[in-house]
């Protein structure tokens, strides 16, 4: 059986998908399954698949079958999807910061149509390429793709690109002294304030930047002072939690955690008290 047959079986058979998901949660079985997938499926393989359920049902995505099959079930970061859907209305301007391969941007763009705006921010060139493919395949070309890192300053930053198996292929911004690996590249950076002044003020922001959340917010002072958007933010460690929550409280926001677990990463929902 070749790797395409393996992918086809796992992606089309609901019983097989459920067995595969459950088995992955058992240490010994999960390890065996991962070893099998590594042997059967090339690490850089990409196949077109349609999301089967949830808010993204029917959307086509170009995914890596070894590491990204969870997107197909339609419940990846379900709490974020619920917040997104309940706050998409005519006139919404959505900033997807750390868009990865653009799934949330696609969901937002399809729901808003011409009645809103979607901006996808992503510094990794390979992910940017996939966002463009997804927008084209799903006829959602109105998504504005900003191929830059979002930070507290406009300029250039070092970005550590991730492999597929590393945190769902999400890279991180790194200090210059740490950016010595071959996979580290230099990328343009921009503040959200700069984008808002040039284009449109956001009403809804999603942030997932692997630990650089505070820097994103520091470059968004004008937005949170004047536009006061709803914020959904993935927090990756205790220090980021402290920095982000303090920053929000000082600007008149209240927040709640979307998951009951206290383990990181976890998602924060913040709304303006006024």
Model-inferred region functions:
Residues 56-82, 141, 146-196:
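Glycine-rich adenosyl-binding loop in Rossmann-like folds that engage adenosine-containing cofactors
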Residues 125, 182-187, 232-239:
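Acceptor-substrate binding/catalytic loop of class I
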Residues 108, 131, 159, 216-220, ...:
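Hydrophobic packing residues within well-ordered alpha-helices of enzyme cores
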Residues 116, 143-144, 203:
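Short, conserved active-site loop motifs that form the nucleotide-linked donor/cofactor pocket
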Residues 1-134, 138, 266-274:
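S-adenosyl-L-methionine
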């Amino acid at each position: 059986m070749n790797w395409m047959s393996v992918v086809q079986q796992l992606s089309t058979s609901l019983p097989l998908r459920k067995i595969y998901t459950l088995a992955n949660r058992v240490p010994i079985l999960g390890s065996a399954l991962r070893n099998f997938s590594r042997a059967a499926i090339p690490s850089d393989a990409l196949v077109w698949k349609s999301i089967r359920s949830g808010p993204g049902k029917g959307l086509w995505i170009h995914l890596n079958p070894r590491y990204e099959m969870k997107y197909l079930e339609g419940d990846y970061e379900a709490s974020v999807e619920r917040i997104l859907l309940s706050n998409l209305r005519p006139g919404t301007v959505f900033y997807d910061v750390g868009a990865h391969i653009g799934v949330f941007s696609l969901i937002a763009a399809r729901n808003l149509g011409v009645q809103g705006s979607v901006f996808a921010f992503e510094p990794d060139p390979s992910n940017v390429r996939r966002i463009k493919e997804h927008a084209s395949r799903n006829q959602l070309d109105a998504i504005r793709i900003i191929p830059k890192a979002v930070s507290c300053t406009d300029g250039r930053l070092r970005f550590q690109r991730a492999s597929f198996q590393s945190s769902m292929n999400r890279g991180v911004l790194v200090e210059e002294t740490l950016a010595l690996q071959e996979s580290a590249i230099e990328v343009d950076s921009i503040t959200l304030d700069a984008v808002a002044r040039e284009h449109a003020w956001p009403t809804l922001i999603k942030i997932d930047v692997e630990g650089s959340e505070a820097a994103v917010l520091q470059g968004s002072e004008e937005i949170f002072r004047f536009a006061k958007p709803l914020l959904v933010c993935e927090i990756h460690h205790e220090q980021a939690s402290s920095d982000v929550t303090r920053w929000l409280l000082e600007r008149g926001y209240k927040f709640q955690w979307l998951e009951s677990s206290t383990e990181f990463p976890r998602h924060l929902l913040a709304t303006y008290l006024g």
